[in-house]
Amino acid sequence: MGKLLVLMLVGMFLAFESLEALEYGDALNKSILFFEGQRSGKLPTNQRVKWRADSALSDGSLANVNLIGGYYDAGDNVKFVWPMSFTTTLLSWAAIEYQNEISSVNQLGYLRSTIKWGTDFILRAHTSPNMLYTQVGDGNSDHSCWERPEDMDTSRTLYSISSSSPGSEAAGEAAAALAAASLVFKSVDSTYSSTLLNHAKTLFEFADKYRGSYQASCPFYCSYSGYQDELLWAAAWLYKATGDKIYINYVISNKDWSQAVNEFSWDNKFVGAQALLVSEFYNGANDLAKFKSDVESFVCAMMPGSSSQQIKPTPGGLLFIRDSSNLQYVTTATTVLFHYSKTLTKAGVGSIQCGSTKFTVSQIRNFAKSQVDYILGNNPMKMSYMVGFGTKYPTQPHHRGSSLPSIQSKPEKIDCNGGYSYYNSDTPNPNVHIGAIVGGPNSSDQYSDKKSDYSHAEPTTYINAAFIGPVAALISSSG
């Protein structure tokens, strides 16, 4: 009888573990599906998000270039190439790092398609060696309207960087995105992979040769942290993609640029570069010791109980860096924590020292897992912050296409001001934007499900992109 009870308990435990694995797999699936709702341009025949339709089919015509496609960045209808490139880099990082886990739930093909939708657009935007289009659409006029992308009639103004008007941040991030993606496609489409890598090299040369901050060339998504982080980030990815020592030597020569930081974002990539480069340190590149020190500083700043903790969690345990769209920082931090714990394990390093406190790899992973679980529902609100995941989730994300009737259900045009009756309606959005992760709760773990609360209710591509790696990391440890 005792033996039978043990077997029953083991069976129940395994069943729970399998269910948990299925839940992470479902979250991964929905995280990727979200991007189909953000697509701009001519939609493919295998489009799964049916409430969307073709949009912005003349983008680029003002300059006689083809800038059709890519992603709408958030809940608006503008295409911002700098954060779109960061999104693409993060997606590719997940595909590289967790290929087996993503394949195990049959999502690798969808993820590659998601990446390619971004890289195809970046390639189009890179019209000559020293020219990159960085924005399509006028942010001010777009943000004053509440329209479906399919009805959009605001100006599709074009912005670009060049040798005479540089933006090293945007060019550097585009280089990183294409270099990372070249690794994703290397084994399945070598010709496309080579094209990506060639453009990545050229973009890096452009970013480095014509150094200038994107602050001077942008109306939205301007740089605050400078361009040195993007140059290090791009060089790290190019080294990973090519093995060419010119890139690792570039990093070593400019290691003094590296800073200990407390965030990883579309603007600040220092810790992303550090996390990539610390792998090379453990492979014997002692000249990269500063990057090891800086990434450890980031980890120590995040870990609860660390004597050098700088980011305090909410009462419910969520990392809280900024009130506006805080989950973007949570998902990127979690990306770094999982990657770094994996790097330590591979190097045979069991722990790190944070001042007077030591943290094991398991403790770092468990904390990272707690952040994923918080987003998926283990939080004081008892709700998922991913639309369509679980039984309770945001129903009014700040998102034009989701909040307005689909063009299939209401073919009549909804103009700039006509959409505000839907915006002001306190009812669930008619189109469930499955997989969208909103900006998240406030510092007290509270969330007001209102379209007007864009700081907390708006999804963005880079929140979702940074979530895919962490949730994939948990698939293998749960099943």
Curated annotation (Swiss-Prot):
Report the GO molecular function annotations: cellulase activity
Q: Which reaction does it catalyse?
A: Endohydrolysis of (1->4)-beta-D-glucosidic linkages in cellulose, lichenin and cereal beta-D-glucans
- Active site (record annotation): D76 (nucleophile), H398, D449, E458
For this record, an example GO cellular component is: extracellular region
Annotated compartments: Secreted
What is stated as this protein's family in its record? Belongs to the glycosyl hydrolase 9 (cellulase E) family.
This chain's protein is named Endoglucanase 20
Recorded source organism is Arabidopsis thaliana
